[in-house]
Regions:
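Short pre-catalytic strand/loop immediately N-terminal to key active-site residues, enriched for Gly-Thr
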Residues: 134-138, 316-317
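C-terminal nucleotide
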Residues: 1-37, 42-48, 54-122, 169-182, ...
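Alpha-helical scaffolds flanking conserved acidic
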Residues: 127-128, 167
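Glycine-rich active-site/cofactor-binding loop and its immediate structural neighborhood
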Residues: 326
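Hydrophobic alpha-helical hairpins/lids featuring a short glycine-rich hinge
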Residues: 110, 128-134
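Short, conserved acidic/polar surface loops in the N-terminal third of protein domains
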Residues: 90-92, 138-142
Length: 401
């Protein structure tokens, strides 16, 4: 197989890489997220027409990218994906075609190649190892987290001082524009910034506002929330396409549900800041009832059964995470009934997933100290740089990266 091939090769990266000297190794990780309210209002064309708002937070489930740089004179990208159980190697300068195999990596190469002239001239190869704590299609934004981790690793390798807004927009561009994967903007921004955020989406700007929630409120919220895997994954593209079609057609039910969902995101943010944790269950349930009106296919009989049994067992409210059709349910419980809800979920074949809130976003670091011409330091935390660092959004509302 030629170096420019984009066909996966069993053992390809390991076979090529192990004979070349490793100059240095760097790693990145980006967190996944749970969305409390407003999901769907970040999906075009709704935010461009009416403005969107989302309340979400990141959790301790991550997507990882490890890059080893080889001085081999080949100029290749050697990829191993644990999630897809596949390996391949590509030329960093050749044209690449999309065929359903590691397309996210190929799109990242295409979009980021203009920033890599000096590195490409060196003819060094990169061994890329990718894995995630949750598979795609489970509603946690894992694909976008992986894309952000990829952008972060390449930014570190290229010594690019991109702001969090620019990194999030590059990840959005790779997924939504280059690959045409349907979806909104919240996932890329959540994975980049990390923490509890209230996000506002408009036609030409995104603003990320970190929420300062007291520790005791976070502890109570953590205790009363349950993350439950339903045992099914889903392809969300068709659901999102139907939602987009409803907005473009001006379908009143879709538009009204999205407007009310946006209002719930604002209300939930305010209740959290006031410390009114008890209100979250009711608002989650209201949001879930509205979400089912966005488009056909958001819920299924199995999901409805899960939710009904959880409510019977003591859940006050909850919602399906992601676009719909499968994945994870987020449930809010009375503290006395938490164990009963977990038993009800297990009885239906589901699984309660342990999680904790994560307050850092994208992180990159050196594993092995770089030699001359390598990255000089770790990438600063997105949260440390704040929400007004440039790119698409911030107080200036500057153009997209």
């Amino acid at each position: 197989m030629t170096a420019s091939s984009d066909r996966p090769t069993p053992g390809g990266p390991a076979a090529v890489a192990r004979h070349a000297p490793v100059l240095y190794t760097l790693r990145s990780k980006a967190p996944m997220r749970i969305s409390f309210a407003g999901g769907g209002t970040d999906v075009a064309p709704f935010p461009e027409q009416r403005g969107g708002a989302v309340l979400n937070c990141t959790i301790d489930k991550y997507a990882y990218a490890t890059a080893r740089v080889f001085d081999d004179g080949r100029g290749e990208l050697l990829v191993t994906s644990v999630d897809y159980d596949t390996s391949a190697h590509y030329s960093l300068t050749a044209d690449l075609s999309y065929n359903g195999e590691l397309d996210l990596v190929k799109a990242a190469i295409k979009v980021l190649r203009p920033y890599a002239h000096d590195r490409l001239a060196s003819k060094r190869s990169i061994g890329l190892f990718l894995h995630s704590d949750a598979p795609p299609g489970t509603g946690l934004g894992s694909s976008s987290a992986l894309c952000v981790a990829l952008v972060g690793a390449f930014a570190h390798y290229l010594n690019q001082p991109w702001t969090p807004y620019e990194i999030a927009e590059l990840a959005f561009r790779i997924e939504r524009e280059e690959l045409g994967i349907r979806g909104g903007r919240q996932d890329q921004y959540a994975a980049t910034f990390g923490g509890f955020n209230f996000m506002e989406f408009g036609p030409d700007r995104t603003v990320v506002a970190p929420l300062k929630i007291p520790r005791e409120i976070l502890n109570e919220l953590s205790y009363r929330l349950l993350l439950c895997y339903t045992g099914t994954t889903r392809y969300s593209g068709g659901i999102i396409e139907r939602q987009q079609a409803g907005v473009r057609a001006g379908r009143s039910e879709s538009l009204q549900a999205l407007e009310e969902t946006k209002a719930i995101a604002v209300a939930m943010k305010n209740e959290l800041l006031r410390g009114n944790v008890d209100e979250l269950g009711r608002l989650l349930d209201e949001g879930w009832q509205l979400k089912k009106r966005f488009a056909e296919g958001i819920t299924t009989p199995q999901i409805d059964a899960f939710y009904a049994k959880a409510r019977e067992a003591g859940a006050i409210g909850g919602k399906l995470l992601g676009a719909g059709g499968g994945g994870h349910l987020l449930l809010f419980c009375d503290y006395e009934r938490r164990a009963e809800v977990i038993r009800a979920v297990h009885a239906l074949g589901g699984e309660a997933i342990d999680f904790a809130f994560e307050f850092e976003g994208l992180q990159t670091w050196n594993v092995r100290p770089p030699g001359p011409g390598g990255p000089t330091s770790t990438t600063p935390s997105a949260r440390a740089r704040g929400p007004d660092s440039g790119g698409r959004g911030g107080s200036s509302g500057t153009s997209r990266a």
